[in-house]
Amino acid sequence: MIQGIQITKAANDDLLNSIWLLDSEKNEARCVVATSGFEADQVISAADLGEYESREVAIEAAPRIEGGQHLNVNVLKRETLEDAVAHPENYPQLTIRVSGYAVRFNSLTTEQQRDVIARTFTESL
């Protein structure tokens, strides 16, 4: 388990106010920041810190998997979009979300319009 600490008191003055990540499984300490004596990302044995007092510092783990999900919400009926394909003159202001931006439905090609309808209205996931 990894724990973040800020050293508040130590025999070694270089450790004072420094921030470390302690890995209890490897018995190692990684320097996050120190005013002198240690470099950022320097890894030492936890025992090399000697005696010290510290306070816990909250750390946030980076996500292990990059990416995520994106959701475009269009509150429409299928019939409305299908009618807009058949009668675009009746829907000059119909705006939808596509790939994170707003677009007029009539400015899309017929193929793109059909794709939007197919992706927006599905029977199941």
From Swiss-Prot:
Listed GO MF terms: formate C-acetyltransferase activity
Keywords: Organic radical
Residues covered by the Glycine radical domain: 5-125
Domain of life: Bacteria
Family matches, as Pfam families: Gly_radical
SUPFAM superfamilies on file: PFL-like glycyl radical enzymes
Residues recorded as bearing Glycine radical in the entry: 100
One CC-aspect GO term: cytosol
Isomerase among keywords: no
The keyword Secreted is assigned to this record: no
HAMAP family: GrcA
NCBIfam families (UniProt xref): spare_glycyl
Main function: Acts as a radical domain for damaged PFL and possibly other radical proteins.
Name of the molecule in the record: Autonomous glycyl radical cofactor
Species whose genome carries this gene: Vibrio atlanticus (strain LGP32)
